[in-house]
Amino acid sequence: MNNLELEITSKAYNDMEIISEFIAKDNKSAASKMMRLFYKTFETFLKHPNIGTSRPDFTYMDVKFYVVKKNYLIVYRIIDNKKLRILRVLTTYQDVCSEL
């Protein structure tokens, strides 16, 4: 599983844009840092794809969850041991079940 291709869904891009805009209202530098951290985390997933946690209490879908900085939840899926798809980047304040 070392040669996974990264795919980021349009919903995940939209999630990150919303998060960035929200943070940037108070601190543009912090917003940029947060975006860099998300992308660094995606790179970590490519090296360690099973680092996330399955949560059957959240969803029946075969996805993994990974918390970033306590307030953000990355939802991703490994497809055919070839692709790592970032599905969503949510805040922990959102109703995760309804967002999936």
Give a label for each model feature.
Residues 25-28, 64, 85, 93-95:
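Short, low-complexity, polar/charged sequence segments that are solvent-exposed and flexible
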Residues 50-80:
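Basic/aromatic recognition patch in beta-strand/loop cores that engages polyanionic ligands
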Residues 71-73, 77-100:
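Enriched for short, Lys/Arg-rich terminal
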Residues 2, 61-62, 82-85:
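Residue-level signal for beta-strand positions within conserved beta-sheet cores that form or flank
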Residues 17-20, 67, 88:
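A cross-family signal for key residues in well-ordered alpha-helices
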Residues 1-58:
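Basic, Lys/Arg-enriched alpha-helical interface segments
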Residues 5, 55, 62, 94, ...:
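Solvent-exposed, flexible loop/coil residues
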Residues 25-26, 36-39, 68-74, 82:
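Short charge-dense sequence patches
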